[in-house]
């Protein structure tokens, strides 16, 4: 089975849920950018989150850009997505390697302390730009936080 995003709503549209399977997307990114395992996981999380956030956009011409700029060795990461499920991404240092931490890839140390930016271009004169400090640098937690605090009002 290929990649997909599932959307669900409840309470008359007041509650929305999204889930995604993106193994093919992440594998393609790994091959195209010749990424290390830690870069693959980090960019994979951002690609998946960006794809789900892009699916929330209303018009086919809308574009969402998510950027992480941290002080860790992975450098910056950028993902662009749209409501049609088209997504692409870039990682500053695709060859980054760090020792395992408690037997797991250390995404937080690879990303470091930094800022998560969400740019929504919905065809107005200026795009909406929201910046927030990374909370955990694990990417998924940070995307969840920015979605909850900033994007629900827009």
Regions found by a protein language model. Give the residues of each.
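Conserved small/polar residues in nucleotide/adenosyl-binding loops
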Residues: 149-154
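Flexible, glycine/proline-enriched loop segments at strand-loop-helix junctions
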Residues: 36-37, 126-136
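Long, charged interaction segments in nuclear RNA/chromatin-associated proteins
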Residues: 138-144
């Amino acid at each position: 089975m290929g990649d997909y995003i599932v959307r669900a709503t409840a309470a008359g549209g007041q509650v929305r849920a999204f889930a995604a399977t993106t193994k093919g997307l992440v594998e393609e990114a790994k091959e195209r950018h010749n990424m290390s395992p830690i870069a693959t996981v980090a960019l994979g999380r951002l690609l998946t989150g960006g794809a789900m956030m892009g699916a929330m956009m209303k018009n086919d011409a809308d574009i969402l850009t998510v950027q992480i700029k941290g002080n860790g060795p992975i450098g910056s990461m950028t993902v662009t997505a749209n409501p049609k499920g088209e997504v692409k991404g870039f990682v500053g240092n695709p060859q980054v390697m760090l020792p395992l931490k408690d037997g797991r890839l250390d995404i937080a140390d690879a990303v470091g302390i930094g800022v998560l930016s969400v740019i929504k271009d919905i065809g107005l004169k200026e795009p909406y730009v929201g910046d927030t400090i990374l909370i955990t640098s694990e990417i998924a937690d940070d995307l969840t936080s920015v979605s909850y605090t900033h994007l629900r009002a827009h």
